[in-house]
C-alpha cells in the first residue's frame, strides 16, 4: 500500500454531517462509504435506533470506526445531539453520576465497534447569577467588526479580558471536580483499551480554558488514557478572538494529541466549513499531524453538499500528502 493511499484509508468522516437524515445505521454507513471513506467517527447525534445497523455494518466490513464522540449512543429518549447534557463539572453529584454512566456506555460502545478513541467535552465554568458572556455577545452585535480584526481592537480586548477574568474565577473550583470526574473513568477506559481525547472547545466558558488546557492535560500520568483532541475550527475561532496561538497550541500538545477534527472557518467566524474555503492554515497544521497514529476526522456541517464533502476530502489529502 502506498503512503498516499494509507493516509486516505485512515481519513474518517464524522456522522455529524448526516446522522439526522437516516433511520437505519447500516444505510448511513453505506452512504458514507459510497462517498469514498474507509472510516467514520460516530458523533454525538447517534440515536439508539441507529445502533443495530451500525454494529452490523461494521461486522460486515462496510466501513471502520476511527473514533466515537461522547455521548454515543445518545441516552435513551434523546434524538438530537446533546454532548453537554451531563457535565463532569456539575455542582450536582447526580448529574456527575449520569455523566460517568453514559461516558462509560460510550467507552463500551467504542470497544464494541473496534474503535480505540473517544472524544470528550469536559464541562464549563459555573455562575450563580447570569453568565457574563451576554455582555460580550451584546458588544459583538452592536459593533460591525470583522472577526479577523477583533484581536487587535482595543475596545473588544477590554470587554474580552473583563469577561475572561470572571470566567477564570468561576472555573477555579470546577477544575478540581473535572479532574476527579475524569480520574473516575480512567481505569474503565484503560480496561477497555480506549483513549480519551479532551477536546478544545469554542465556547468562552467551556473547560479547560485555553490558557489552562495544556497544563491540565499534562497533569495526568504519562500512562493515563486521558489525552488531547485538537479541533481545528475551535482553535481558529479562539485565535480570532486573541485567546490562543493556534500553532503554539499544536506545539505544546504534540506529544499528547490523539486525534483531530478537521474543518475550516469562514472569515465571518463560522466553523465546520468546507476545507480550503476559509481562513485556517492547513499547511501549518499538517506539520503536526502524525498520519500513522492520529485519528483524522472531517467534521463538516450538515448544510454542506456531497460535492463539498468530497472536495474537503481531496483538499485535506493534498495538505497531508
Briefly describe each language-model feature range.
Residues 10, 32, 36, 77, ...:
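A generic structural signal for ordered alpha-helices
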Residues 88-227:
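Active-site acidic/histidine proton-transfer and metal-coordination neighborhood
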Residues 1-106, 111-115, 137-154, 173, ...:
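N-terminal pre-domain/capping segments
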